[in-house]
Amino acid sequence: MGRTVRQKRKNRSSRPKVKQTNRPKKALNPLGNDLIAKNWNKKETLTQNYRRLGLLTRLQAPTGGVEPGLRGAADDKSNAHAPLGLSERKSTASSAVREVRVKRDAEGRIVSVINEEASAAANPLDDPLNELETDSDWEGFGSDDEAPTGDRVVDQLERMARVPRVKTVRGLSEREVEWLESLVAKHGDNVKAMERDHRLNPMQQTAADISRRLRRLRGE
C-alpha cells in the first residue's frame, strides 16, 4: 500500500556525514629537512624513499611484512648473474667447434688468427646485448645505481649534524618585564610573597620559576 496522509515523514538528520580521508593515498610532502625534500620522489612510498636515501623509517624491529623493492631488486639481482640466459649460451657457443681463418708463416706454423666477427658483427636480430663481450660488462636491472645517492645523502646529513650550533638564549618579552618589575616594586626580593600574591600572580607561578625569571631579567 502507498503512503497515507497520516504517516509522518522521516526527519533529516542535522548531523553532517563524516568523511574519511584516504591517508595512504595522500602524497607526502617532507618539510623537515631541505636535503631530504630535494631528493624526495613523490611517486614512491615513505619506506621506498628512506631505503633509497639510506635511512630507516623506524628504529624498532619490523613487525609485519616487508615492502617490495622499487623494481623487484631481489629477482633482478639473481638475473644479473645470468641475464636472459646469455652467460650459458655464451659459454656453450665458446666451447663449440668452429672454423677460423689463420695466418701461417713459411714453415706452416700459425702466426695469428684472423678475427672476422669484429668486421662482420653478426647480429641478424638487432640484439642490443650482442655488443656485450663478457659477462662482467652486464650491470643487471637492479637498483645498484641508487646506492651512491643514498650514501651521498647520508654523508651530507652527517656533515650537517656535525656543524656546531649557537645556543640561542630565550629573552623576556616586554609584558613579562613589566610583570616582574611590578612584583619587585611591591615585594622586593621576597619570592615567597610574590608566589602568594594572587593579584599580581594570577597564573600562580612558583617561587622557583619567578626566581629563574628574575635572574634572566638581571642578566645573571
Swiss-Prot record:
Signal peptide: none
Keyword presence, Transmembrane helix: no
Positions of region (Disordered): 1-33, 62-82, 199-220
Any one annotated GO CC term: preribosome, large subunit precursor
Subcellular locations according to the entry: Nucleus, Nucleolus
InterPro entries: Ribosome_biogenesis_Nop16
A matching Pfam family: Nop16
An individual GO BP term: ribosomal large subunit biogenesis
Keywords: Nucleus, Ribonucleoprotein, Ribosome biogenesis, rRNA processing
Basic residues compositional bias, start-end: 1-26
Predominant location category: nucleus
Protein function: Involved in the biogenesis of the 60S ribosomal subunit.
Quaternary state and interactors: Component of the pre-66S ribosomal particle.
Family indicated by similarity: Belongs to the NOP16 family.
Protein name per UniProt: Nucleolar protein 16
Gene: NOP16
